[in-house]
Amino acid sequence: MARIGVETDVPLKVKPHPKFKEIYTATLEEGSQRLATRNLTPGLNVYGERLVKFKGVEYRIWDAFRSKLAAAILKGVQNVPIEPGSKVLYLGAASGTTPSHVSDIVGNSGYVYCVEFAQRSIRDLVNNVAAYRPNISPLLEDARMPEKYAMFISGKVDTIYCDVAQPEQAKLLADNADVFLKPAGWVMIAVKAQSIDVTMDPEAVYRQEANILRKRGFDVKEVLNLEPFDKAHAMIVAQRCKQ
């Protein structure tokens, strides 16, 4: 089950991110600044993250060492196509760390479809996250076979976020986009270089995956190295080219 979090009573400051809606920067009592999202389920945390309250609103501290999306934001990514009201397909949801923050961002007017193949991870996702968040649907499916779960996804999605340790990450993402993504929709892919080719230089792997997306009809906006938060990882952000 979800954990009951402990709020801090120490005064701090929370301010909206200057670029991205429903993402915040929290200044903690020791002066450090951390990313945060407004908690959709007040009083509950997901992975032991700290809960803080500012002006009557509860926020969840977002650990960039446990979330590649948070790492990309701290590294200065210019496009985060996940916002209030967005419908998101999340491939490789694992136990729900980052999906829970995506759930906070899209809010009750948005929705997150979470595809995960590992049974233990999907169990944690169901019991600790989806059970308390009505805007999340967990799907025990193989992201390489989008046709198997198409019946569970209503309409087209605004954004596909992909974090799967597969050798053909960009192809997998593009295959899902062909089925589920809206025209001119966006994708974000957290590329793990060693899952694709351990013999290649990571930067070469990132270029290869970006080129695959281009060949599949995407305009690649950014390729962002995620070190020091994640070694040999990059975030690629792309938009489907208008037909």
Residue ranges and their predicted role:
Residues 1-59:
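N-terminal auxiliary segments of SAM/dcSAM-dependent transferases
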Residues 2-8, 121-124, 132, 174-242:
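C-terminal substrate-binding/active-site "lid" region of AdoMet-derived donor-dependent transferases
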Residues 18-21, 42-49, 63-87:
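Conserved alpha-helix/loop element of class I SAM-dependent methyltransferases that forms part
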Residues 73, 92, 160, 238:
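Residue-level signature of catalytic and energy-coupling elements of molecular machines
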Residues 83, 106-107, 180-184:
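Helix-to-beta-strand junctions that scaffold the AdoMet/dcAdoMet cofactor pocket
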Residues 83-94, 111-113:
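Conserved class I S-adenosyl-L-methionine
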Residues 94-108:
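Conserved SAM-binding loop of SAM-dependent methyltransferases across substrates and taxa
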Residues 113-169:
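S-adenosyl-L-methionine
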